[in-house]
Amino acid sequence: LKCHNTQLPFIYKTCPEGKNLCFKATLKKFPLKIPIKRGCADNCPKNSALLKYVCCSTDKCN
């Protein structure tokens, strides 16, 4: 699986074994949905008071 791991959409990395999801975190209260954090995960992180996480399982989907 290949996931973006920076705010720039053309930079990505291959996820290590066992990390089979890509995630993207955005600020909940900010009108523009600019990714704050992206990367690989073994399960989808939980939303927090400030961040909303979206997960997916195909190459470069985040």
From Swiss-Prot:
Where does this polypeptide localize?
A: Secreted; Target cell membrane
User: What InterPro entries does this protein map onto?
Assistant: Cytotoxin_Cobra, Snake_3FTx, Snake_toxin-like_sf, Snake_toxin_con_site, Toxin_cobra-type
* UniProt keywords, alphabetically: Disulfide bond, Membrane, Secreted, Target cell membrane, Target membrane, Toxin
What Pfam families would the database entry show?
A: Toxin_cobra-type
On the tree of life, the source organism's domain of life is: Eukaryota
Disulfide connectivity for this sequence is: C3-C22, C15-C40, C44-C55, C56-C61
Which cellular component terms (GO) are annotated to the entry?
extracellular region; membrane; other organism cell membrane
MF (Gene Ontology): toxin activity
Expression (tissue specificity): Expressed by the venom gland.
In the record, the note on similarity to other proteins reads: Belongs to the three-finger toxin family. Short-chain subfamily. Orphan group XV sub-subfamily.
Work out whether the entry's keyword set contains Disulfide bond.
yes
Q: What role does this protein play?
A: Has low cytotoxic activity.
Major location, coarse class?
secreted
Name it.
Cytotoxin homolog
Further remark, if any? Answer: Is classified as a P-type cytotoxin, since a proline residue stands at position 31 (Pro-31 in standard classification).
